[in-house]
């Protein structure tokens, strides 16, 4: 597989059926052994599943212009455990917090953000906040939306 992406590809695991429901024939690549438990059908009705997390992320991308068109600003660029960034457009700011660590990581909101005033749009774990921050769970992601009020004239 050297020089190709074949080593990173496996058939989509649609169900717990033979060959993960991918084909009734012989798949080009072997199906992952975890397909009876990890498959689309098993995650379909679980609101906390990875499948539904990504569906919600895609919905936000389609519905919120700030996700698509907002200017980008990164926070904590030297961190090798957190990827934190802002998207800003008009009166909206989106704060995205992603942990790339298998271990818990302390997170403190950047200056100008009060997590309690933001609307938590997407989360992969809990929504616990303490002292304008939280301790991430392994590989946790959160997305907050902040809207500013129009200034009085």
Q: PLM features: residue spans?
A:
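C-terminal beta-strand-rich structural cap/linker in extracellular carbohydrate-active enzymes
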Residues: 130-153
